[in-house]
């Protein structure tokens, strides 16, 4: 596969950087349609086509970028990043983690290969194309706060340690032991900066005198959760705090799920320490498996809800059981190099990977991608007009209005004088006769 971001010679680096910033911010996720346009036109011309709505030949990308096409200011985003001590890296730069992230393009590789073979293979290409509509692929840029001048994750061995936010003392202790063992073989400990297992792994790596990095599900200008701000500040001084989301981007559930693919891709191996049956950490494990990276899980008590997910990974032969801290060191590749990326089908659909951490049914069960994005952009306490949901959901207004109607019919949102919010309790009566 050719390196991401190759473009025509003679483009000013500042112009190129602003083009990538625009592409990074204009769509909610880096889709196949976005990358097809970048590969066809180059990043600078792709930006011009999106801004001028010259996308008649690509209605999918037109829909994905319509909501933000005229509002993105790359200069302002770069300024906000600089104020937070962050920088922007993009494909084509020497510090871009090309080897690690290239496997995220596998769905497009499979689609193109099936097309070149000249057969639909019983509808397989159509299925892959449908999955590509909602899958996040290679990010179009990363915002990096702190860390060395050249991203350490590019060349150093990396171990991801992930798990539940509701960690037990056992889970926190094991996460710390695994992190210390990774540091002992000069590996960077990577996690998501969350409460529970994540912060235990970060802190243990730092305490052992090693390096740690965090991948956030929001902009790096504000650390989240605030309770972990101290740990995240130290991680920024270590290997860095990263995000694919521009400064000012807030937290939503689907951004956590999209973020998990980056943790899996940037790591040489992934260990799940504690995870409930529907833990988001399991989506990281799924991505690691789809990218053909080693997966391990820490077995736990059959009576512990926090170990149900880990025990299932081991039972189903999707992860090896870790029975001592020393065992984890054998999973970590000694160096970073090309990963296989054309030998396996696309990862499972995002809908199948949309886990919550509670182990209980959630309002997201049964919702498609558009419905989840609108629902996440809403508040349970503050009424909002449909126009206010455009930026947060990354969807055009007409689509938001349509989705609100469906959510209303399901009893998940309520309306008052043209404004909307999430229902605090789900109504039992069927709601009809909705007008905008």
Regions found by a protein language model. Give the residues of each.
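Glycine-biased, small-residue-rich flexible motifs in mid-sequence functional cores and linkers
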Residues: 1-16, 28, 92-436
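Long amphipathic alpha-helical segments
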Residues: 1-89, 410, 414-416
């Amino acid at each position: 596969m050719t390196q991401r971001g190759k473009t025509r010679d003679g483009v000013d680096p500042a112009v190129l950087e602003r083009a990538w910033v625009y592409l990074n911010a204009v769509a909610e996720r880096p889709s196949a349609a976005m990358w097809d346009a970048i590969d066809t036109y180059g990043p600078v011309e792709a930006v011009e086509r999106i801004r001028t709505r010259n996308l008649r030949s690509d209605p999918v990308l037109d829909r994905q970028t319509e909501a933000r096409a005229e509002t993105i200011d790359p200069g302002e985003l770069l300024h906000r990043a600089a104020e937070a001590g962050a920088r922007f890296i993009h494909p084509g730069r020497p510090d871009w983690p090309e080897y690690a992230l290239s496997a995220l393009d596998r769905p497009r590789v499979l689609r193109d290969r099936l097309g070149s073979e000249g057969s639909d293979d019983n509808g397989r290409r159509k299925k892959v194309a449908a999955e590509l509509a909602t899958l996040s692929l290679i990010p179009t840029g990363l915002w990096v706060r702190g860390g060395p001048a050249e991203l350490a994750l590019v060349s150093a061995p990396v171990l991801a340690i992930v798990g539940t936010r509701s960690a037990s003392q056992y889970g926190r202790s094991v996460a710390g032991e695994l992190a210390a063992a990774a540091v002992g073989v000069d590996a960077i400990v990577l996690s998501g900066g969350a409460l529970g297992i994540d912060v235990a792994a970060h802190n243990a790596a730092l305490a052992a005198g090693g390096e740690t990095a965090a991948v956030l599900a929001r902009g790096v200008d504000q650390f989240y959760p605030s309770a972990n701000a101290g740990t995240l500040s130290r991680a920024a001084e270590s290997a860095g705090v990263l995000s694919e989301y521009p400064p000012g981007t807030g937290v939503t559930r689907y951004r956590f799920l999209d973020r998990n693919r980056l943790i899996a891709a940037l790591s040489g191996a992934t260990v799940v320490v504690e995870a409930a049956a529907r833990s988001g950490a399991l989506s990281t494990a799924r991505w690691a498996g789809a990218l053909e990276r080693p997966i391990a899980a820490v077995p736990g008590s059959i009576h512990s809800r926090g170990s149900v997910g880990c025990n299932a990974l081991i039972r189903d032969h999707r992860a090896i059981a870790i029975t001592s801290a020393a065992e984890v060191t054998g999973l970590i590749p000694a160096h970073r190099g090309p990963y296989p990326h054309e030998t396996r089908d696309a990862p499972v659909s995002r809908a199948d990977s949309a886990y919550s951490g509670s182990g209980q049914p959630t309002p997201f069960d049964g919702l498609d991608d558009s419905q989840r994005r609108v629902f996440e952009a809403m508040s349970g306490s503050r009424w909002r007009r449909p126009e206010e949901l455009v930026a947060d959901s990354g969807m055009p207004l007409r689509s938001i209005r349509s989705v609100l109607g469906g959510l209303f019919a399901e009893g998940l949102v309520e309306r008052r004088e043209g404004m909307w919010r999430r229902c605090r309790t789900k109504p039992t009566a069927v709601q009809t006769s909705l007008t905008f």
